[in-house]
A protein has these predicted regions:
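A donor-sugar binding/catalytic signature common to diverse glycosyltransferases
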Residues: 65, 289-334
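Boundary detector for helix-to-coil junctions that initiate low-complexity/charged tails
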Residues: 1-11
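Conserved aromatic-histidine-acidic binding/catalytic patches
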Residues: 49-59, 220, 242-245, 285, ...
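Secretory-pathway glycan-assembly enzymes, especially type II membrane glycosyltransferases
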Residues: 16-222
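Acidic carboxylate-rich catalytic motifs and surrounding loops in phosphoryl-/glycosyl-chemistry enzymes
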Residues: 78-85, 243-251, 333-334
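Structural motif
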Residues: 193-194, 243, 303
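Catalytic donor nucleotide-activated moiety binding site of glycosyltransferases and closely related
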Residues: 198-204, 210, 226-283
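Short, aromatic/basic amphipathic alpha-helical patches
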Residues: 91-100, 252-263, 318-320
């Protein structure tokens, strides 16, 4: 997604004001939750409900953590409504902070809510300017933490800036099934490991995502795969005998790279979480579980590498996985 500045950014904000009106009306029209919320003060709800484009898993976490940081600074009650294309509680549970919606807290009634749609906005200005006394439904796919920290943890405030990983771990811990898979995967690897992440974004034709087109050329596909395999071998020579975990969005590539001695992969299929539900085959629970498993396994590596050609996508997924426990991260262009 492009990042806008100046007049273009102001136009984006204006466009989003109209989007907010449309969302408010559309959601209320089909909602069965229109009662007056039973809360002492308005709650702030991070929305992942399928009513707008949310992005992939990492983009969703960016928006969630941004709103949580804002609420934590100001003492606002924070909740998450994550229902698309699955319920977040199927994979993650509340850790130190309970973000789950309680009976009677939530409403879609326009009399009691204010939709704040900030998809693509890299500044938290409109969030700072909120004066609403209504329940806030927040849509965002950007990491606003730096801007929020600079605003509320200025020198002289006595506040320290928040760390992305600490906020994530305050909110989330793996559910029972996810935790079991994490332990089983770590046992399979057998010790410390480092990780390499490759994001082909459908270049190899096996990961439908939005309108990204495959190469559709067997020779070019093989050239790209070989280049990435060579990068893996170069990386392994640098790290000696330590195990290497490789994650990617292409099953073609994972099948090839798994043939290299010392490389570990996480079995299973992948799908993009936003708008790709019709491409998800087989057991959907297992398919989405793999994304969470990849994320948590990356977060516990000794170091995470993002590797790709200029044509490949420089995903933020490994960047934020590394942020969870503040482990070293390096991006390599080949």
């Amino acid at each position: 997604m492009a990042t806008y500045y100046g007049k273009k950014y102001k136009l984006l904000e204006l466009k989003h004001l109209f989007k907010e009106l449309l969302l408010t009306t559309k959601i209320a029209f089909k909602s069965k939750e229109l009662g007056k919320p039973k809360t002492k003060s308005p709650i702030y709800v991070a929305m992942i409900d399928g009513e707008a484009y949310h992005g992939g898993m990492c983009d969703r976490f960016k928006g969630i953590i941004s709103l949580y940081a804002y609420c934590k600074y100001l003492g606002k009650p924070f909740r998450i409504k994550y229902t698309y294309p699955f319920k977040l509680e199927d994979y993650l549970q509340p850790a130190a902070y309970d973000w789950t919606l309680k009976r009677g807290e939530y409403t879609d009634n326009p009399l009691y809510i204010r939709v704040l749609y900030m998809r693509g906005e890299h500044l938290a200005t409109r969030l700072f300017n909120l004066r609403a006394k209504r329940q806030i439904h927040f849509y965002s796919n950007r990491d606003l933490l730096e801007h929020i920290n600079k605003t509320y943890a200025k020198e002289g405030t006595g506040r320290r800036p928040f760390n992305w990983g600490e906020l994530f771990c305050e909110l989330f811990k793996p559910g029972t099934i996810l935790q079991e898979r994490i332990e089983a995967t770590k046992e399979s690897i057998g010790g410390d490991y480092y990780a390499a992440v490759f994001r082909f974004q459908n270049l190899l034709g096996d990961f439908p995502e939005y309108r990204y087109r495959p190469l559709n050329d067997k020779d070019k596909e093989e050239e790209l795969i070989t280049k990435c395999l060579d990068a893996v071998k170069t990386l392994m020579a640098k790290h000696g005998n330590m195990a290497l975990l490789v994650t990617a969005d292409s099953m073609k590539f994972l099948k090839r790279v798994s043939q290299i001695d010392g490389v570990h992969i996480i079995p299973g299929t992948l799908t993009h979480m936003d708008g790709q539900k019709h491409h998800t085959q087989g057991n959907q629970f297992e398919t989405y579980l793999k994304s969470f498993l990849d994320f948590y396994m990356l977060s516990e590596a000794q170091k995470v590498y993002r590797i790709g050609t200029p044509q490949m996508y420089h995903s933020a997924f490994p960047v934020f996985a590394a942020k969870m426990h503040d482990i070293p991260f390096e991006s390599i262009t080949i």
